[in-house]
Amino acid sequence: MDVVITALGPDNVGLADPIIHYVTGQGARIAEIQMYDHDEEQLFAMLCRIELDPSRLELTRKAMALVAEHTRLAIRVWSPDERAERPRLALCTTYLPQTSRTILQAIADGHLRADAAVMIGNRRKCEPLANEFGVPFEMIGDDEGTPDERAMVQLLDRYQIDYVVLARYMRVLPPSTCWQFAGGRIINLHHGLLPSFPGLRPYQDAFASRMLTYGATCHFIVPELDAGNQIINQQTYTVAPGTSLSAIIERGQNENEPACLLEGVRRVVDREVKLHFHRVVVT
């Protein structure tokens, strides 16, 4: 089975050794390994993807828990094969409900083979939507909308989340959160076509460039901001010359963005694609 081990904590010598020695001693094949020392923060981060005999998964979890105690690393052992039939999703939201509603409706209609385990928000705007679909809502933002990142990680663990879906979640996840759920577990919707229109105002930037084709991008999040675009899906629409910016944004938010994210999430949960190193590959 495919197993992803992530480790994050204070930097020191020899942190990777006990992890690598254990998994190789179990006869696992290492398919991918990444290690980073963030010198400025004195932080060590590691991802190790292995192919492991399913009967050894729980033993590996217990062994990694012991390694975590001795090294002060936060270690997670996750396999997409455990809940392959219905992976558990966390929908992260801020203000706009359209993309989350489309995901929840697709699950309810049986078009998306997953379970919405929790909705996490740094604002309460989407809480009524969570209540409508019977999904627990967890608020992690303060009065200014600043999220408690530690609380988010704790919630993702508590709800046993397989994939984190940033459904127009208007905050940048810190590298520590990205590392703890690395390996293609964080899916983001960007409301513009990457790499042409990054940033917070892609509609306005495309409009200023006199574009007639607009779009959205669904991609994996990786800890390194300069690692490129790990694109899962892109969806576009074309408007007539003279179409107002407000009409373009309305169509994008209500139709194009939800469709783009839904198809991207479907490709991931149906195991059509996965993240390998920094590339999206067909499985």
In which residue ranges do the predicted regions lie?
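A conserved regulatory-domain signal marking ACT and ACT-like small-molecule sensing domains
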Residues: 1-87
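Short, glycine-rich nucleotide/cofactor-binding loops
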Residues: 10, 89-98
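Short, conserved loop/helix-junction motifs that constitute active-site signature segments
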Residues: 109-114, 179-182
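Adenosine-nucleotide cofactor-binding segment
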Residues: 131-159
